[in-house]
Amino acid sequence: MRDRVAMMLRPLVRGWIPRAVLLLTVAFSFGCNRNHNGQLPQSSGEPVAVAKEPVKGFVLVRAYPDQHDGELALALEFSQPLAATQEFDTLVRLEQDSGNHDGGWSLSDDAKTLRYPYVEADKHYTVLISAGLLAATGSRLGKPRKEPVYTGELDPVVGFASRGSILPARGSRGVPVVSVNVPEVDVEFMRVREKALPAFLARYHKAGQRSSWELSNQGNSRKRLSELADPVYVTRFVLDGKKNERALTYLPIQSIRELREPGLYFAVMKPTGSFSDAFETAFFSVSNIGLHTRAYKDKLFVHTASLRSGNPYKQVDLLVLDAKGETVLQGATDDNGNALLNYTLNAGHVLVSRNGRDISILPFNQPALDLSEFAVAGRENPWFDVFAWSGRDLYRPGETLRISALLRDRDGKPVKPQPVFLRLKQPDGKTFRETRLQPAEQGYLEFTQKIPSDAPTGRWRVEFRTDPASKEAVQGLAVRVEEFLPERMKLELSSAQPVLRAKAPFTLTADAAYLYGAPAAGNRFTANLAVAVEQHPLDNMPGWFFGDATLQLPRGAKETIDITLGADGHLVHDIVLPEEAKPVSPMAVVVSGSVYESGGRPVTRSLKRVLWPADALVGVRPLFDVASGADANGMARFELTRVGVDGKPQSAKGLKATLVRELRDYHWRYSDGRWDYDFTRRFENKETRTVDISTSHTTTLALPVEWGDYRLEVFDPVTGLTMRYPFRAGWSWGDDNRGLDARPDKVKLALDKTSYRAGDTLKVTITPPHPGKGLLLVESDKPLYVQAIDANPSTTLEIPVTADWERHDVYVTALVFRGGSASNNTTPARAVGEVYVPMQRKDRRVAVGLVVPKQMRPAQSLPVTVSVPELAGKQAHVTISAVDAGILNITGFPVPDAAAHFFAQRRLSVDAYDIYGRVIESFEGGTGRLKFGGDMALPPLPQAKRPTARSQTVDLFSGAVKLDAKGNAHIQLPVPDFNGALRVSALVYSDTRYGQRDAETVVRAPILAEASMPRVMAPGDRSTVTVDVQNFTGKQGKFAVKVEGVGPLAVAEAGRSVTLGIDGKTTLNFPLRALEGNSVAQVRVRVEGNGSKAERHYDLPVRAAWPQGLRTQAHVLNVLAPIAFDPALAKGLMPDSVNARLSVSALAPIPFASVLQGVFEYPYGCAEQTASKGYAALWLDDATIKSLGIHGVTPAQRLERLEGALGRLASLQTMNGHFSMCGGNSDVNPVLTPYIAGFLLDAKDAGFAVSDAVLQKALNRLSEDLLSGAHLFYGNDQSEALMFAHQAWSGYVLARVNRAPLGTLRTLYDNERGKAVSGLSLVHLGVALSLQGDRKRGEAAIEAGFAKSEGGRPEVFGDYGSVIRDNALMIALVRAHGLAKPAYEARVMALGRDLEARRRSGWLWLSTQEQVALAQLGRALLVDQKKQVSGTLYVGKQREEIAASRLIGRSFDAAALARGVRFVPQGDVPLYASFEVAGIPRQAPVSDDSQLLVVRRWYTVDGKPWTPGPLKEGQALIVRVSVTSKQNMPDALLTDLLPAGLEIDNFNLGETRQWADVTVDGIALSERANAADIKHEEFRDDRYVAMLQLTGGRTANLFYLVRAVTPGTYKVPPSLVEDMYRPALRGTGRVAPATVTVVQP
């Protein structure tokens, strides 16, 4: 070889010397000519313009073969979009008689390209295009076209045809490979080391395409493939297949000697001559062992069967490997192929079964068999049980939650009395309260909790545990907390049609009545109808998809009925289905019917029916996780079936199944000052197959997919319908494991009885999908019975029922195994059957007699008699609940049933794992030939501060009442003044027996007077009080009706007289006007006649349509001259809202009192706000309240607020000790932790009960942050300064309890103090150093802190602070710890100047941090204050002598200010006086978009912009609020007050599904959560509130629904958005229209 290279080089060497001489000569000649550029040519060349005429009009641009991923289509591209309604199959044809397919030509999304997929490669086609082909513009092609197209050859492609990993040892032809135009492949085989099996199977879950990086990378602590497996063989295979045809070839690995050693092999394949980075991979073991396992609590049942015959496989060795490959357990199966191992399942372990050369491997990191089609659901079955109940499941904030419960074992029998730990959780999952309950007599538990008036709305949960540290609750009860009004009417919708048919009307029946017993005579009834594609028309077929999911239907609901009900409140109406409801797909037809109270408030119910387009439908069930999608570069697997309306299978012949891929053509566009991209869709038919379906079993379909969007289309030639199922491939990052290939075939099981008891014989009939050997098991949390069976159709077997079965989690399981054979293309399989075995418990349910009056009058006692003869002479109790049916109907709350709970089916507690879903399938195909061989992973937003109305909710409860010796109980329940219906329910319990019964009592007065009005009004609003008066006195009479307003309300035409017959009714409307004010007014209705009278009182809040503000004025008194309150401070404010305060002291003019009360009443409750409100409650003791002149704060309120803050903070604490900002999944900001921990220490020092666990966890967190360098605050421009501030504050809090290491504090001062940008962080560090003993460094740090320039602090720093907050805290800290110096006091005056500057710039907005800091400063100053002030206070002519104190404070209302307020001080000057006025302006705030742009728009329910005009009662609108911030705002708060006559349709309660598909400006309401980063939202009586995170420059869109309810004209409030921690950052939206008018229809 060396000689050959030398010979090749020799001529080059020989020619080198002469050439060198020549070059040297040339070089010298250039040097003589002095041409520095050598022979560099001049620039030349002329551009040639290519003449390209633009395409004009409607023409064919090109005809071409469109090939992608081995699939062909003829494509015709036109210059303009085509009209989509044409019959393309008649307008465009192939000249060759190839048999055009119906629906063969498909139109792309941009409508410019037609595609025809039914063509072959390497063929010439001629396409005939009709001159009549129509463009969307109306133009026609004009002349026929004849276009030749040559399809060319298919691109080469190859891959493994199966995702399986078990190759049957007997009767298998090898590993299947599918290919197109690939004649040969190179394959390398590697054997996985046994100890590496767990690591390998954790990384490689299934076959698929992998890159070289995936195969060799060692990232994320994973080993390279070479460290897991050894190369054993490399070879080349010659594949079958004709040119341009897909071929299936088996690689005959059984004949390769190097692959005969038992083990798991990994195969890597590539086409010969290919140098792509993508490799096809598969792994497999060759075995005849079928492995099935069943995992119990501490046992593992193993059954081994022959993959060839299905018979039991005897004496198979078993061993379990842990994650490191070490053997942790070994055993063997018996002669029946069974083994029961003492083993608890671990997902990181692998089970290896071996017998001779057979080896099967089962990793436990795969999902258990999917048994969702079996009735195996239920709750867990622990040793004890709790049945919890309440009278209702819907509460308003401020009401009292009452829960009852029974402690029993899992069969409803008594247990030894022991404490039960209850946890009340908020909607965000955080614990609100935790308490210990001790069972009373017969295991009865009772719990009550007042729901705070500022409680977050949503689903709360009550959980029970016997171990308070347990993460898992044994039982729970969900309740809803929402602002609602009880319904006054009931409405039932029904239809005799089980399904709908096209062109036939939907016959709707409606029955409406008042809950107090009168029919809804003359009431308005409306109904809206919405249609949508129904992909799940059969409830008994979960997981199956039907119909055409791509079908576009009109979004939103259409009004179909608007009618007045007759005298009986009954209606039968035929609704004509809309034109869009064509028989092309099953459709959900939803009717939403509403009956209206006289005042306009609706009661709404929905009814759904499914429109069937044909007698039978084709359905598909994806064999992958629907949410994650199919795997890319693999096979997407489906099951197909065809069923009738009754759900029974039907056969089908000649179904056309087509895999369609969606392709997107992206293009960039410049819009709104920036580049963005858009795309158009086009679709390619990838593969079409003909499929037959039988009635006995489903058909499986496997289709190759890459990464992207697809849909499966199945055309049924009998019905002419096409089922379309869209799906994605390759979108589930990090979830390349498993899918739903673990779904087994189904064995039908039928029991001979409905219930059993020990001693019975159970007979079970087995109907398998195929005959075979198998097992019959009885299981609970352990195997109770195992028997080998021969399963044939209708096989009946008997099993003795033993005492072990006397529980409620017993199931009969049947396993039937089918052997496999390559000769008949049968793959080994197992089928599973499950049926629950109910135990006989009828004798433990008792009959309950319940006697209540059918009708009674209000304000009387309701007599209830309970009789349970079966419990006579036995100890038993009963609880009675009587609840307004108008509350229960909102949620459909069922009657509590203890027997149904205790004896209910529990979930199957067995998880099954096996290898049958991973057996490599047998297909038809050729055998490859060896070419050569070789050897090579909320905040709660409590209701905003406003006057709040009391809403009457009737919920009566007796508690536990003991039955007498005869089994009877007599109970009286006091019924309030209320008209309606009470559902009276009784729950009876003894030690082991239970019963329940309910009845209804109508409550109504002789004269019924019920009023309707808005939930709230704003000053200036005009509305209507609607009063229904009905005569139930039993005789005709004349009745005087009087309506009056108390407070800021005016009622016109307040007195009326009406004559009513027996049971006669009239509706009266009284004009109502809201006057100026800000309080809870009342509407009082009084009706007298026929010797009876009725009087009703209704709270009606009158509140402004915008928020209040604070005005301040400060004075320095250098002489003892009288000072007077300037009435101008209250100018322009609503008098009823004015709250003025005068403060006089020797302290600086800082509004201590107002900020303390302001933060105490702050309405929202994130972590920082909760701690701040807690501070206010902590400091507002009696002495402070008195000295500051604060009104309206009682000791009880203070204690409730403080305890609520402590409980709320405990619920917000995370596992690592920090605190979640707003609960749930909201962010954690570490800078809050020292602030909150400091509050907890202060509360503890004040003697309040603080959870030591919460406090210690927070202190431990601070200690770790101080020692480890704290949080790095990535993304913050001042990250180092913020980290220093956090460490300094943490060190200060720890130093208070002597837990701050002095060495760490010194290091922080010596090395890091230069990073401080605020003086506060240095003061925190200095105080900490001083407390821990280093006074010298401490004083130096404090001095440096006060020397810091106030301007050095960034406006946005990330610590919720400000210059005002920092200055106040700095002074308060040094004073509190005796480190103050006179030089520092200058900051106090600076504070006063800052506050005055803010006041002069407009309203004085202060954040909660600023308010708390100012209050803390005030307390510190008062402690050292020696000077006192006294004087005389004059209010008008009233005089009050005020004794000397350090601070004088008094509060006044608008009337006092009008009379004149003057104070004559006494004391040593200088003195400081401050005047503060809080109130609501008469005029609306002007729109302000300087920081935030807030835009509110209104839309109709079909998503179109609403043109302002009168709204009809019941008319719904969609509200969209768009918020754009100029800067990032992580804590924005939107408050959108409603016009008074409108009410929110609460998404948590209402029938809103008919609006889900409505689209507003391209955003579907069902996707509204993605239109803004909403942390929490609430639907309140009079407002929509949302906390959200805003990103600078981007727009957030929020949506909610409103409905016009009460006639009148109402002011439209502006939308307000503010930063909760930087209140100066706010935006006020423009009001348009200024008013909204609601009219009667």
Curated annotation (Swiss-Prot):
It comes from the Bacteria. Pfam families: A2M, A2M_bMG2, A2M_BRD, bMG1, bMG10, bMG3, bMG5, bMG6. Residues 1-31 form the signal peptide. A lipid is attached at C32 (S-diacylglycerol cysteine). It is found in: Cell membrane. A lipid is attached at C32 (N-palmitoyl cysteine). There is a cross-link at C1166-Q1169 (Isoglutamyl cysteine thioester (Cys-Gln)). GO terms for molecular function: endopeptidase inhibitor activity. CDD domains: A2M_like (cd02891). It is a lipid-anchor. The keyword 4Fe-4S does not apply. Its main location: membrane. Keywords: Cell membrane, Lipoprotein, Membrane, Palmitate, Protease inhibitor, Signal, Thioester bond. InterPro entries: A2M_bMG2 (IPR049120), A2M_N_BRD (IPR011625), A2MG_MG1 (IPR040639), A2MG_proteobact (IPR026284), Alpha_2_Macroglob_MG3 (IPR021868), Bact_A2M_MG5 (IPR041203), Bact_A2M_MG6 (IPR041462), Bact_MG10 (IPR041246). One of its GO terms (cellular component) is plasma membrane. Protects the bacterial cell from host peptidases. Belongs to the protease inhibitor I39 (alpha-2-macroglobulin) family. Bacterial alpha-2-macroglobulin subfamily. This is Alpha-2-macroglobulin. It comes from Xylella fastidiosa (strain 9a5c).
